[in-house]
């Protein structure tokens, strides 16, 4: 089955066809390291983490490059506010980013280049553009001639003539055209700078990714990714620079993930709804955040709310509870016939095929997770129907299906914990917020068992209701009565 990926450049889904067979070269725009990362950064990191994991699951070799912008106007401004150097500030927040990523359980990219370590590569491209009359120096700055690239606007779908007609006359008299953008910025007092043929200065933002992607992936590579907010002007300008300098296509496929809102509002510090990754992980297990993010296909908008996170937690707990229950099954009797129906067996035998069909359709994690959740329902139903001495065929089917589900869930970073430990830690965390202890719950359960043994159904129901009021749900099964906390975080 071919993987079909939505390409922003063409505006349609296309088969993924790596330039080098079975080797995908991927470049993703990383953070500007001046502050703590927020949930939007988490979505970006997790989306491309999922893509890399899935491609490797399919036995593709993946070279994954994600950069750090460690010199920028925002970094300089924040450094001046806090009284530290731009380098020290950038390094601090790169370290914070790595901590966040480790806590989220993301794979490290193969290469994580920093802009400040690739100044010469940027100067080289700028010089190539100047030599081609596609860029010009002006008072220590260097600007890209937008009109020199006829295809400008092909990624964002913007018409350069319309943009120029709507542009105000540039306040910057050093520009020939208001649409021209900076490749190199002349140094200012107190700012970091590097020597160049045009005098001391620092690179513009857009040239950084053109230089780093060319160094590590070549002039033409497979996939360039980022958020939809980067399509224009950042990625549009990258194409103009790179294709102008190299004379060949830049990235063949452009992947852009959707925005994250908070209760249907754009996230912003002024609205007081700015959620950092640290904030979220203080309240939720990282796999809950993953289950939430992957409940929506990566290109679609994603709205963060406590209710949505509770739904994600409920789904994740069901996965872990099922994993735990199946792991406890005995081997079974090889002489007994299977009880699982042919219909359910066929569904379980097709889990991987249906999961791949979903993922091959532009990495549709929402549909892929739906396949796993549906399989869990079948497994739970089949497990409840097992006798005290189950058929070995049924046990083999259930254990094999659960092992496969755990493997596939790992592609989106779920079911990575020991099931018993995950469920126990969750119980302890949830109990810390309500007025009952685990020992008291177990005491109530024993009282209820005694009542049921004496056929005192009224007392049995009364105990269940008492526990429900305290946020405890009982679950009767073949192995006894279990319980879970149903109150929200």
Swiss-Prot record:
CDD domains: Anticodon_Ia_Cys, CysRS_core. GO terms for cellular component: cytosol. Binds 1 zinc ion per subunit. A motif ('KMSKS' region) lies at residues 266-270. Its EC number is 6.1.1.16. It holds the Pfam family tRNA-synt_1e. It catalyses: tRNA(Cys) + L-cysteine + ATP = L-cysteinyl-tRNA(Cys) + AMP + diphosphate. InterPro entries: Cys-tRNA-ligase, Cys-tRNA-synt_Ia_DALR, Cys-tRNA/MSH_ligase, Rossmann-like_a/b/a_fold, tRNA-synt_1_cat_dom, tRNAsynth_Ia_anticodon-bd. Its main location: cytoplasm. Its cofactor is Zn(2+). It is found in: Cytoplasm. ATP binds at residue 269. Monomer. Belongs to the class-I aminoacyl-tRNA synthetase family. This is Cysteine--tRNA ligase.
């Amino acid at each position: 089955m071919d993987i079909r990926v939505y390409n922003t450049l063409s505006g349609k889904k296309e088969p993924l066809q790596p330039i080098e067979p079975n080797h995908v070269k991927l470049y993703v725009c990383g953070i500007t390291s001046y502050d703590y990362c927020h949930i939007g950064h988490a979505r970006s990191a997790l989306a491309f983490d999922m893509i890399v994991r899935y491609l490797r699951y399919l036995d593709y070799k993946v070279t994954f490059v994600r950069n750090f912008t460690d010199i920028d106007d925002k970094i300089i401004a924040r450094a001046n506010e806090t009284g530290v150097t731009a380098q020290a500030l950038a390094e601090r927040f790169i370290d914070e980013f790595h901590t966040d990523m480790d806590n989220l359980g993301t794979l490290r990219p193969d290469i994580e280049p920093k802009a400040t370590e690739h100044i010469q590569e940027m100067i080289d491209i700028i010089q190539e553009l100047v030599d081609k009359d596609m860029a010009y120096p002006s008072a220590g700055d260097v600007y890209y001639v937008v009109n020199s690239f006829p295809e400008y606007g092909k990624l964002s779908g913007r018409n350069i003539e319309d943009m120029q007609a709507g542009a105000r006359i540039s306040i910057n008299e050093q520009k020939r055209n208001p649409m021209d953008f900076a490749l190199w910025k002349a140094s200012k007092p107190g700012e970091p700078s590097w020597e160049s043929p045009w005098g001391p200065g620092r690179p513009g933002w857009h040239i950084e990714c053109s230089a780093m992607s060319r160094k590590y992936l070549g002039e033409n590579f497979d996939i360039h990714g980022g958020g939809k907010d980067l399509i224009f002007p950042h990625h549009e300008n990258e194409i103009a620079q790179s294709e102008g300098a190299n004379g060949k296509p830049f990235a063949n496929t452009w992947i852009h993930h959707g925005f994250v809102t908070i209760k249907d509002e754009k996230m912003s510090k002024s609205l007081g709804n700015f959620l950092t990754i640290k904030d979220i992980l203080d309240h939720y297990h990282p796999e809950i955040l993953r289950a939430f993010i992957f409940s929506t296909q990566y290109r679609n908008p994603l709205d963060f709310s406590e209710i949505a996170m509770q739904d994600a937690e409920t789904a994740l707990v069901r996965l872990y509870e099922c994993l735990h229950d199946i792991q406890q099954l005995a081997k079974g009797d090889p002489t007994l016939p299977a009880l699982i129906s042919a219909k359910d067996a066929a569904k379980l035998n097709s889990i991987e095929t249906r999961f791949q069909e979903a993922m091959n359709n532009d990495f549709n994690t929402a549909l892929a997770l739906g396949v796993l959740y549906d399989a869990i329902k079948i497994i739970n139903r089949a497990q409840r129907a097992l006798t005290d001495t189950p058929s070995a065929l049924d046990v083999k089917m259930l254990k094999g299906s659960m092992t496969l589900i755990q493997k596939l869930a790992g592609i989106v970073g779920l079911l990575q914990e020991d099931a018993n430990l995950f469920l126990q830690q969750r119980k302890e965390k949830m109990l810390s917020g309500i007025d009952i202890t685990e020992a008291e719950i177990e005491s109530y359960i024993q009282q209820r068992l005694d009542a049921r043994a004496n056929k005192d159904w009224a007392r049995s129901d009364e105990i269940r209701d008492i526990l429900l009021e305290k946020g405890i749900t009982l679950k009767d099964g073949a192995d006894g009565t279990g319980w879970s906390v149903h109150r929200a975080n």
